[in-house]
Amino acid sequence: MSTPAADGFRMPAEWTPHERTWMAWPGPNPTFDHPDDLAESCRAWADVARAIRRFEPVTVVCGPGRSAEARDLLGPGIDTVERDLDDAWMRDIGPTFLTDGKGGLAAVDWTFNGWGAQSWARWEHDAKIAAYVGDLAGAKTYASKLVNEGGAIHVDGEGTVLLTETVQLGAERNPGWTREQVETEIHAHLGTSKAIWLPRGLTGDYPPHGFGTLGHVDIVAAFARPGVVVAHHQPDPAHPDHEVSKEVIGLLKAATDAHGRRIEVVEVPAPTVLEADGHWADYSYINHYLCNGGVVLCGFDDPRDETAAGIFRRLFPERTVTLVDARTIFSGGGGIHCITQQQPKN
């Protein structure tokens, strides 16, 4: 059986041109278990979609009968389609898109099991969304037996991928898989050749701190360009992520990429708030989304919002940085990057 890499496909970096962005619309489920929570979440998702639509097309997958409500909040110019959904995190349930540099488009359909079969998760329908979206996009779909999500990987487009040990190597997702087997599967499906492993994610991403993914990398570290990584920095020693971020930053600074370059780390300070919803806050500016000509950045009505925006403006001077309040999204277990999935131009 062929693999994407063997067929000439690779995952391009997020900063390369996009054809469109895919999202999923919130519906009644354990994540949004009260009508007020659901209504607030729909407004938050719509705010993100509208911010992205300024820069590129957006398609939102809605549960049956929910597209009319979605369009009312989304406004004009955003497409909707209907399909059975369990949740609304398109980064994780959607496909990982690949290109071959010759006009071809492919999609990886990772195995999805509700972020490690967590007690609150439902995934009967979400496990089928990647293949559905890939088909709508006209992509050649490759299925992988690896339990993985889009928020658990971040690539530089030049052969390097960021991973976390508690996700791909966790018994909740891939019992019996060795590190070497995981790397082989990842490289075969992303076209990468070097993995940089981080030990874990942020504290709030694990039980008992509400809804979490057990350590997704896209809230901790992300490539800004080849050889340069933005990393979450918690400056307050009262927060357990002070030690977590110090360890992650140290590992990144000691790492090299697929081309042997030493990683340059740009530290982005966490918002000042330490707790949210009765748990340690995992608010992070790292969970941003790059779209054509824009950076959609998580905002928290926090004094450090503008500090973070300034860092991203310096990193991406050719892009418009837009802050969108992400506190409601984070209360459900993720951020702006978690609810978006880019389809690259092919």
Swiss-Prot record:
Keyword Hydrolase among UniProt keywords: yes
Catalytic activity: agmatine + H2O = N-carbamoylputrescine + NH4(+)
Domain of life: Bacteria
GO MF annotations, alphabetized: agmatine deiminase activity; protein-arginine deiminase activity
Active site: 338 (amidino-cysteine intermediate)
A biological-process GO annotation: putrescine biosynthetic process
Protein name stated in the entry: Putative agmatine deiminase
Organism: Streptomyces avermitilis (strain ATCC 31267 / DSM 46492 / JCM 5070 / NBRC 14893 / NCIMB 12804 / NRRL 8165 / MA-4680)
Native organism taxonomy: Bacteria, Bacillati, Actinomycetota, Actinomycetes, Kitasatosporales
